[in-house]
């Protein structure tokens, strides 16, 4: 087992390229380095500098390296799905390639608004929509690999069409293993009622990339009972440090050892919006905890 630990802007309360409730990017990078991390994701494109030379200089002076980043789109949309994803890839791809990153995560657009929680799309895809999702994901994976040397990992995510275990199983069955891998997010998986430990054991060959966080059981119960949307659930404190919550991280570590996992483990604890003094202590505690239990 070799887990390369990193973190992400998400763990500092960053969800958008620009928002007055988010801390300046310079402070984010400073605090990542202070907390002891060496690897990061770039976060929403435009939050960190998009000029490659500027970004490389800022990373280098803090001793930081980049594992990858993500794009968000609607691959099932017959009109805008591929064109939007291709634009996103053409913007982000050269930066990831220039920084030596290996992974591109695809996040399907939520069927609720990230800021308001209001419904914006159907909760379920029909058969044709699901096939478009699969086909567009394949196309994105092929293009990302051929043009930028990136491996595509599909981020199964709350309030998207691939969040519950049966939906993820169907997606895995429908996609080509040599093209499409899965980003297993322990928090999102548990949020949707799944067991990330068992899922890791079953599907480890398709999982080269992890997001590490936990879920507060009491908040999850309230969210489920009242059907509270994702954005509001995050603001309520749904996601917590790995040392707390419903996911048994010692058991998850054992699963990683048993399957001889080699890959990234990115600490990505959603906490938007977050007071500026909140993320750093959590980041330090989380890194210490993961090292203590033998992850990273």
PLM feature spans:
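Conserved beta-strand positions in the central sheet of alpha/beta enzyme cores
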Residues: 41, 68, 105, 153, ...
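Active-site mouth loops of central-metabolism enzymes
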Residues: 10-24, 76-86, 122-130, 240-243
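Glycine-rich, proline-tolerant flexible connector loops at the mouths of alpha/beta enzymes
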Residues: 39-59
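Active-site-proximal loop/turn and secondary-structure-junction residues that shape catalytic pockets
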Residues: 11-13, 44-46, 72-75, 108-112, ...
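Metal-dependent catalytic neighborhoods of phosphoester/phosphodiester hydrolases
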Residues: 49-56, 81-86, 276
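N-terminal small/glycine-rich loop or linker at the start of catalytic domains
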Residues: 1-17, 67-76, 112-120, 230
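Histidine-acidic metal/acid-base catalytic patches
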Residues: 1-36, 60, 100, 138, ...
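Active-site acidic/histidine proton-transfer and metal-coordination neighborhood
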Residues: 81-182
